[in-house]
Swiss-Prot record:
Gene label: alr
Catalyzed chemical reaction(s): L-alanine = D-alanine
Protein name (database record): Alanine racemase, biosynthetic
Pathway: Amino-acid biosynthesis; D-alanine biosynthesis; D-alanine from L-alanine: step 1/1; Cell wall biogenesis; peptidoglycan biosynthesis
Protein task: Catalyzes the interconversion of L-alanine and D-alanine. Provides the D-alanine required for cell wall biosynthesis.
Cofactor (UniProt): pyridoxal 5'-phosphate
GO biological process: cell wall organization; D-alanine biosynthetic process; peptidoglycan biosynthetic process; regulation of cell shape
Assigned protein family: Belongs to the alanine racemase family.
Active site positions: 34 (proton acceptor), 254 (proton acceptor)
Modified residues (N6-(pyridoxal phosphate)lysine): 34
One GO MF term attached to the UniProt entry: alanine racemase activity
Gene3D superfamilies in UniProt: Alanine racemase, Lyase, Ornithine Decarboxylase, Chain A, domain 1
Protein keywords: Cell shape, Cell wall biogenesis/degradation, Isomerase, Peptidoglycan synthesis, Pyridoxal phosphate
Length: 358
């Protein structure tokens, strides 16, 4: 078997969910499990949080159906709403909390004539300008839906654009926009993503939406996961499968982009971009070999990558390699690659086996 595995610590996810709840006592929290629980395995994560989570949040009906099959009673928030008119009947059967983010969705919901009333979340475009009603339109839709028989709860939701950058002026503007609608009669309110859960108590409202923090990656630009008390959930582990000596002036990898400036010892690792490791990872990106730091040398290949082991003479074929995990944070690797931990975690592909610890 190819020596590559993503090991997921489900107890870390439970710890991180509990931390979110401790940040906002008496509030409830939707555990965000979209995109296969950010690459960690939705089935396993939902099962691990079955008795702890107040609800779950997903991006599409297919994800919602998977969660409902695992949890008969949890609230399931459909973050982007229904994409087609035909989906409303299934949303009703699944008893979803339904986001309505535009007039087209609102009209389709009214036309669906559902037999069972649903919890409806009107989405405010508070400044991100991605989804949602402007304040005036949202007020009009509140008036249309407040007493509609198809609506069980009428709720308010929005999403921050820059909460990861503390004290960003847009965050305060978005909060003020949200608060400006609370003269309306809403049953529940939700605004706080992971960054806001951790740093903006005024945004906690009734329902939190912890996402990336559940998986032990920091949502903040200036604080590490460890500083926030988060535990990493995924370790991506591979193995050294080859070693060779490379002379000064010789190159490594596709494009011959890495040139040895000294006699070099190069190791080949059983992980590549077809596994989700970014092809754009530059030379110098950190890895752990046998628990000690090494760096990438040359371009990442489809199934392999190369590391410079010149300073690790004790390294041997078969040694374990940690691409990220408990010893090397996914956020540090992401920074080296010019991206975010969100992307690295969610892009680990299906051909990488997942193993779970509890």
């Amino acid at each position: 078997m190819r020596p590559l595995v993503a090991t997921v610590d489900l107890s870390a996810i439970r710890h991180n969910y509990a931390l979110a709840k401790r940040c906002a006592p008496q509030r409830q929290a939707f555990a965000v499990v979209k995109a296969n629980a950010y690459g960690h395995g939705a089935r396993e994560v939902v099962t691990a949080l079955h008795d702890d989570a107040d609800g779950f949040a997903v991006a599409c009906l297919e994800e919602a159906a998977e969660v409902r099959a695992l949890h008969a009673s949890a609230r399931i928030l459909l973050l982007e709403g229904c994409f087609e008119a035909s989906e409303y009947a299934l949303a009703g059967q699944l008893r979803l909390d339904l986001v309505i983010q535009g007039a087209e969705q609102g009209e389709a919901f009214l036309a669906a004539g559902l037999d069972i009333p649903l919890n409806v979340w009107l989405k405010l475009d508070s400044g991100m300008h991605r989804l949602g009603f402007d304040p005036a339109a949202l007020r009009a839709w509140h008036a249309r839906l407040r007493s509609h028989p198809g609506v069980r709860e009428l709720n308010l939701i929005s999403h921050f654009a820059c909460a990861d950058e503390r004290n960003h002026p847009l965050t305060e503007q978005q909060l003020e926009s949200f608060l400006g609608l609370l003269d309306l009669d809403f049953d529940q309110r939700s605004l706080a993503n992971s960054a806001a859960v951790l740093t903006i108590p005024a945004a906690h409202m009734d329902w939190l939406r912890p996402g990336i923090m559940l998986y032990g990656s920091t949502p903040l630009a200036d604080l590490s996961a460890a500083e926030l008390g988060l535990k990493p959930a995924m370790s991506l582990g591979a193995q050294l499968i080859s070693l060779r000596e490379v002379a000064v002036g010789e190159s490594v990898g596709y494009g011959a982009t890495w040139i040895a400036e000294r006699p070099a010892r190069i190791g080949t690792v059983s992980c590549g971009y077809a596994d989700g490791y970014p092809r754009t990872a530059p030379a110098g990106t950190p890895v752990l070999v046998g628990g000690r730091r090494a760096i990438l040398a040359g371009r990442v290949s489809m199934d392999m990558l190369a590391v410079d082991l010149s300073d690790l003479p004790e390294a041997r074929v078969g040694d374990p390699v940690e691409l990220w995990g408990a010893g090397l944070s996914v956020d540090e690797v992401a920074r080296a690659c010019g991206t975010l931990g969100y992307e690295l975690l969610s892009k680990v592909t299906a051909r990488v086996p997942r193993r779970y610890s509890h």
